[in-house]
UniProtKB/Swiss-Prot annotation:
It comes from the Bacteria. This is Undecaprenyl-diphosphatase 3. It comes from Bacillus cereus (strain ATCC 10987 / NRS 248). Belongs to the UppP family. InterPro entries: UppP. Bacitracin is thought to be involved in the inhibition of peptidoglycan synthesis by sequestering undecaprenyl diphosphate, thereby reducing the pool of lipid carrier available.
Amino acid sequence: MNWLEAFILGIIQGLTEFLPISSTGHLYLGRHLFQLDEAGLFLDTMLHIGTLLAVFIYYKKEFIYLIKNPFSKLMLLLIVGTIPAVVIGLLFKDFFEDISKTGITIGWEFLVTGFFLYMADKXKNGRKKMDDITYKDAFIIGSFXAVAIFPAISRSGMTIVAALWRKLDRETAAYFSFLLSTPAIVGAIILQFVDVFQGKAESISSTSLIVGTLSAAFFGYIAVSWMIQYLKRHSLKVFAYYVWGLGILILTLQFTRVF
C-alpha cells in the first residue's frame, strides 16, 4: 500500500468514525470501490490511533480533569457506559466479525443503522446536560454502543440515538457520545496490537503509517467539531437517508453480482 492509499483510508476513518455512518463499513467499501490494497492490521490500528488523537485534542480539558479527578462522576459515567461493550466485545467479537464481513451483511447493517437514525427524532427534545446524566443513562447508551460490534452499525450513531432517547439535549448527546467513544477506540487498539504482536499483521511502510494516522487525526477532529455543532439544530434523518441509499446500493450490487 502506498502513502496516497493510506491517506484516503485515513480520510474515510477520520470522517466516518464520528459521523453516524459507520467507519468500519466505509473502510470495507473504500478498499473495494477504489481497489485499494488491503490496509493490513497494523495500518488499521494506526488509523484508530489517529482518531483517538483527534478525541484527545478536542477533549483535552476533559481528559486533564479526568487525570486530576480519577474518581469523579464523569469518570464513573464513562466506566459504566463502557461495561456493555467490553462484555459483548470480549465474548462475541470473533463470532460477529466472522459473520459480518460480507457485502450482503454490511448492506443490511447499513439499513439497520438508518432505521435507528431515522427514529432518533421521534422523541421530544430532551434538556439533560452533562451534570444531569445518570448512571442508568450511561449504561443504556453504552449498551447501544455494544451493538456496533457489527462492522456497519455506527457506534457514534447508536450512542447519539440512545442519548437522545434518554432525553439528553442534542449538543450534549453528541458531546457525551464522542467522549464515550474513547474507551471503545482504546479497546480496539489494544485488541489489534495483540494480533500485531502475534504476527498477524502485514508489513507496511512507515511513510504510509504516518500519513494514514495523521490523516485520520485531522479529519477526525473536523468531524467531531462539526458534528457537535450540526446536531444542535439539525436532524439525523439526512444520515439515515444516506446509509439507506448505501445499503440498498450494496445489496443490489451483491444480488446482481456486480460488487
